[in-house]
């Protein structure tokens, strides 16, 4: 793909001092040189910047995942316990309703997170169903 016998000149003059076209230049610029390696340097700098940015994002993402994973696992265990107890108690209507309300998309709604994206300590829907299960258990022990 590359050309054979291609060797870029390190510096190339855009115009010559001998050129009369630029003698009347208002700014009186000296020769302007273009570094043939400038594009390569710029590409390496850009890639280095992008690599650094990606690395920082990955570590930040991993940190966020590590913090949120335990909260998510705790919530998942609570939901599983609620559904398991309702199923074991034979409360099929409550079980059906709980599966709808405790759907992952619903319990992870943004309204249950604070401004720092931390889950509220007492998730209102999970707490509601824990109370319902407790009532069903109490009713079952009385019967």
From Swiss-Prot:
This is Protein YAE1. Keywords: Cytoplasm, Nucleus. Residues 1-20 are annotated as: Disordered. Pfam families: Yae1_N. GO terms for biological process: protein maturation. GO terms for molecular function: protein-macromolecule adaptor activity. It is found in: Cytoplasm; Nucleus. The lineage of its organism: Eukaryota, Fungi, Dikarya, Ascomycota, Saccharomycotina. The complex LTO1:YAE1 may function as a target specific adapter that probably recruits apo-RPLI1 to the cytosolic iron-sulfur protein assembly (CIA) complex machinery. May be required for biogenesis of the large ribosomal subunit and initiation of translation. May form a complex with LTO1. Belongs to the YAE1 family. Residues 48-88 are annotated as: deca-GX3 motif. It comes from Scheffersomyces stipitis (strain ATCC 58785 / CBS 6054 / NBRC 10063 / NRRL Y-11545). PANTHER family: PROTEIN YAE1 HOMOLOG. GO terms for cellular component: cytosolic [4Fe-4S] assembly targeting complex; nucleus; Yae1-Lto1 complex.
């Amino acid at each position: 793909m590359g050309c054979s016998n291609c060797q870029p000149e390190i510096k190339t003059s855009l115009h010559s001092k001998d050129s009369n076209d630029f003698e009347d230049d208002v700014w009186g610029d000296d020769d302007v040189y273009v570094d043939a390696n400038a594009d390569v340097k710029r590409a390496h700098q850009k890639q280095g910047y992008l690599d650094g940015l990606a690395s920082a994002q990955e570590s930040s993402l991993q940190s966020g995942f590590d913090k949120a994973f335990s909260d998510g696992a705790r919530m998942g265990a609570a939901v599983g316990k609620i559904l398991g107890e309702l199923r074991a108690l034979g409360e099929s209507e409550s079980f059906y309703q709980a599966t709808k309300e405790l759907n992952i998309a619903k319990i992870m709604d943004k309204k249950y997170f604070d401004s720092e994206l931390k889950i509220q300590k007492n998730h209102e829907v999970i707490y509601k169903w824990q109370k319902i299960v407790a009532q069903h258990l109490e009713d079952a022990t009385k019967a």
